[in-house]
């Protein structure tokens, strides 16, 4: 009896025999065929079929043989079937003589009498402006109406379930300009999905309707969003940013108004560095710069795992802050497919940065990971700067792409979603695709009211999103960029501009800061009525770092600063010393336990919980644990003998990490509590009582750990790198050796 697979093969063979009159044998000509459109494909296929002889009975042996072969193939291994399939050419069916036309729905989904001004005044519609072109032979209004129908309540036929309410939420075409391919559609606010947990709006619903199925319609050549307007009542349902560059300025000690350029970089190479070299690169840049970000593909690669590289970054930051006296910032990539993974990454990073947590931003690849990832970060970590990276956006936003939406629309949506900052390219002043008019993107992100290509958007106090400029920028390109934009209140991430500088990343970072200063001095008239380029050259004569940028990026210098060699007296040599840094010095530097704003008091700066005003009680918040770090800090608590925890054990084992005790004798001790889930001292004292029995009896809580029950998970236990007790016992085993 034949096997089931062989029987299946015979059936396939019979199918091939029956279909012998319907298809032609593949030829080399069809193998290389590339069809740009379906209609063209069908026409080519039809012309090729006319070249073939009509099937006859002589084809039957061939068909039967093919059927037998198919039977054997089906009865063989999967690998054999794959090999046969790969060897076959695609055969196209004969073109159908029937030309399908879309249902003309303009009587329902179009109302050209509607006034845009009135639609905006009513505030009940999201307005979207498209560049849309129907395919040849299709009426513009009918296609636009079909476009609106497919984007809202309709389909390609009338359905019996439609009622009056359904029609009341139809999307409506209210303006067309066929000659310029312009089409505007009004979407009722009620169409868009809302959260069931809090009633808030969701961007995925906006995109599903406005840029969803309409991108694949058979009667549309292309359609692309060029502007979108959100009415105030609907805009308020989105999160918007929770922090932005103002918070960075505050951390950097620059106030909250016109704090200027945040000089940043991307660690280069973008991939391939292991943890320690990565930390070294951070330390080197922070000698002159403010801000470092993970590049968008950096995360948790096997050769550079987060639990190894983040501690190196923290060490580098502490050392750089101590040596420069200036705060530093880092943006850690927490992008992942799984929201739980994103949250886990974020919590881990915050635990490692501890009291420097406010100096840490979270980077999310917002385009490739989607709006869900942006919202996960925004809602779970509202106190962190949400760094929106747009890698991949060019596939839909590029001017060369006629579908999707523009870069302007993309960045506008990021503000609505809650991005603290988003990359905006370089407005044609760097290597990325763009135009000088892209400054309107920055205006839409930062102003409370701004004009887009088609709509005037009022933000009603929604926090601004900070433009992040990157892509081929260096000190020489910055002055003209600032002049085009009109200000320098942006974040710069110059990878090559810093690490490509001939004298190293410290000088590269400093040169970028000098590029901003040179522009400001020229703007203030310090150099008289000379051109901007001549003003920058005058500045460079007395500033070696930006002069080094001229010597490094000579092609840029030739293009932007004609005659710079003669004006700077360039001889081919540079007086700038090569940058260097000592990793051992960095590793041995005293840990900087403070945050970045020295004006803050220890009591405010080091709190790790919250006060219940009603009961005047301080509650410890595990989410703000700071002592799970490389050393103890005195704000956590004191041992029973009064020894601050930043010196306990470290006095014997790690003297290089001991910093000054900021607590003033006689003043109120920092009110934080050890919780018993952390561990026990060797004498059995639970850590929620250690020291507090003497210094903070009012904060002592019950010991929640039951004898014999499992200890808390490792991440909430002591880790070896936290520190040592005075007798040398590592904190991972302190107390547990005796008690557990």
From Swiss-Prot:
GO terms for cellular component: chloroplast membrane. It catalyses: 2 (2R)-3-phosphoglycerate + 2 H(+) = D-ribulose 1,5-bisphosphate + CO2 + H2O; D-ribulose 1,5-bisphosphate + O2 = 2-phosphoglycolate + (2R)-3-phosphoglycerate + 2 H(+). Binds 1 Mg(2+) ion per subunit. One of its GO terms (biological process) is reductive pentose-phosphate cycle. The keyword Repeat does not apply. Its main location: plastid. The record marks 431 as: Transition state stabilizer. PROSITE patterns: RUBISCO_LARGE. The active site is at residues 268, 389. The chain crosses the membrane at residues 56-76. The keyword Cytoplasm does not apply. Keywords: Calvin cycle, Carbon dioxide fixation, Chloroplast, Lyase, Magnesium, Membrane, Metal-binding, Monooxygenase, Oxidoreductase, Photorespiration, Photosynthesis, Plastid, Transit peptide, Transmembrane, Transmembrane helix. Homodimer. RuBisCO catalyzes two reactions: the carboxylation of D-ribulose 1,5-bisphosphate, the primary event in carbon dioxide fixation, as well as the oxidative fragmentation of the pentose substrate. Both reactions occur simultaneously and in competition at the same active site. Belongs to the RuBisCO large chain family. Type II subfamily. This is Ribulose bisphosphate carboxylase, chloroplastic. It comes from Heterocapsa triquetra (Dinoflagellate). The gene is rbcL.
């Amino acid at each position: 009896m034949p096997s089931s697979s062989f029987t299946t093969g015979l059936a396939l063979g019979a199918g091939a025999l029956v279909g012998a009159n319907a298809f032609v044998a593949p030829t080399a000509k069809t193998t290389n065929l590339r069809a740009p459109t379906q209609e063209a494909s069908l026409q080519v296929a039809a012309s090729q079929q006319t070249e073939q002889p009509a099937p006859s009975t002589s084809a039957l042996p061939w068909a039967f043989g093919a059927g037998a072969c198919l039977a054997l193939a089906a009865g063989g291994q999967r690998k054999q079937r794959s090999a046969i399939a790969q060897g076959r050419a695609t055969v196209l069916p004969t073109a159908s003589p029937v030309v399908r036309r879309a249902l003309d729905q303009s009587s329902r989904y179009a109302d050209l009498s509607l006034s845009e001004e009135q639609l905006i005044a009513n505030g009940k519609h999201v307005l979207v402006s498209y560049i849309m072109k129907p395919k040849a032979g299709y009426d513009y209004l009918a296609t636009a109406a079909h476009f609106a129908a497919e984007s809202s309540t309709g389909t390609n036929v009338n359905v019996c379930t439609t009622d009056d309410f359904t029609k009341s939420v139809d999307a409506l075409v209210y303006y067309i300009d066929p000659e310029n391919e312009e089409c505007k559609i009004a979407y009722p606010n009620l169409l868009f999905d809302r959260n069931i947990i809090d009633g808030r709006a969701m961007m995925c619903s906006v995109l599903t309707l406005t840029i969803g199925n309409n991108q694949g319609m058979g009667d549309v050549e292309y359609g692309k969003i060029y502007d979108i307007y959100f009415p105030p009542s609907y805009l308020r349902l989105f999160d918007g940013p929770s922090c932005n560059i103002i918070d960075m300025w505050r951390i950097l000690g620059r106030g909250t108004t016109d704090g200027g350029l945040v000089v940043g970089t991307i660690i280069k190479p973008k991939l391939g560095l292991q943890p320690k070299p990565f930390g070294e690169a951070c330390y080197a840049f922070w000698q002159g710069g403010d801000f470092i970000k993970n590049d968008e593909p950096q995360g948790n690669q096997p050769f550079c795992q987060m639990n190894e590289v983040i501690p190196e970054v923290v060490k580098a930051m502490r050392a750089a802050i101590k040596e420069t006296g200036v705060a530093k910032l880092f943006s850690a990539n927490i992008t992942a497919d799984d929201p739980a993974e994103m949250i886990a990454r974020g919590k881990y990073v915050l635990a490692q940065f501890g009291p420097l947590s406010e100096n840490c931003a979270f980077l999310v690849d917002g385009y490739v990971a989607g709006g869900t990832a942006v919202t996960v970060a925004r809602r779970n970590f509202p106190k962190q700067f949400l760094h929106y990276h747009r890698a991949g956006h060019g596939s839909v936003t590029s001017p060369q792409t006629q579908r999707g939406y523009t870069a302007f629309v993309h960045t506008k949506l990021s503000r609505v979603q809650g991005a603290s900052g988003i990359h905006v390219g370089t407005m044609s002043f760097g290597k990325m695709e763009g135009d000088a008019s892209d400054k309107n993107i920055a205006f839409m992100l930062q102003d409370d009211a701004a004009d887009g290509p088609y709509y005037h958007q009022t933000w009603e106090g929604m926090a601004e999103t900070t433009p992040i400029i990157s892509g081929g920028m260096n000190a020489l390109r910055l002055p003209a960029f600032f002049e085009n934009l009109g200000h320098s209140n942006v974040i710069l991430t110059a990878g090559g501009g810093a690490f490509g500088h001939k004298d190293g990343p410290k000088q590269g970072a400093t040169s970028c800061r000098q590029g901003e200063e040179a522009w400001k001095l020229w703007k203030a008239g310090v150099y008289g009525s000379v051109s901007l380029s001549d003003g920058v050259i005058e500045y460079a004569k007395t500033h070696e770092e930006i002069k080094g940028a001229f010597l490094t990026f000579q092609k840029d210098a030739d293009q932007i600063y004609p005659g710079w060699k003669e004006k700077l007296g360039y001889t081919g040599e540079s007086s700038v010393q090569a940058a260097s840094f000592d990793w051992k010095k960095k590793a041995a530097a005293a840990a900087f336990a403070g945050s970045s704003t020295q004006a803050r008091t220890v009591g405010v700066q080091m709190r790790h919980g919250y006060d219940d005003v009603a009961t005047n009680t301080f509650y410890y918040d595990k989410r703000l644990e700071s002592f799970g770090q490389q050393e103890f800090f005195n704000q956590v608590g004191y041992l029973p003998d009064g020894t601050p925890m930043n010196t306990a054990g470290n006095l014997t084992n790690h003297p290089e990490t001991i910093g000054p005790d900021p607590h003033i004798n006689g003043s109120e001790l920092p009110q934080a509590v050890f919780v018993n889930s952390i561990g026990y001292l060797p004498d059995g004292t639970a850590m929620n009582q250690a020291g507090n029995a003497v210094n903070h009896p009012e904060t002592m809580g019950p010991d929640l750990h039951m004898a014999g029950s499992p200890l808390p998970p490792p991440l909430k236990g002591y880790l070896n790198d936290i520190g040592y007790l005075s007798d040398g016992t590592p904190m991972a085993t302190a107390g547990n050796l005796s008690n557990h």
